[in-house]
Amino acid sequence: MWYSHQPDENRASKLIGTKVVNTANETIGDVNEIVLNKDGKVAAMILGVGGFLGMGEREIAVSFESLRMNRDSNGNLVISVNATKDSLAAAPQWRWDTTRK
């Protein structure tokens, strides 16, 4: 029942706001939300993309399996996705289903 964290684990609360880069190491956005499935496992991350200083940003959903988490040379968490800025700009905008509780 009791749990001890493992060295390679991350706290979900610390993922919000984490920078997201593409494979060319271009910053493409940041993490706005984390979506859990019915079993409590991470299904997707909602990324804020395309904005500047919080203006004009839109949200897209990216499956958790398509994201990679690594540490930079300073030990900071960086999330990466194999996508171009153009493909993310063309991604459908995420909208929460407001009928769900």
Predicted regions and their residues:
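Peripheral interaction segments used for macromolecular assembly
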Residues: 1-101
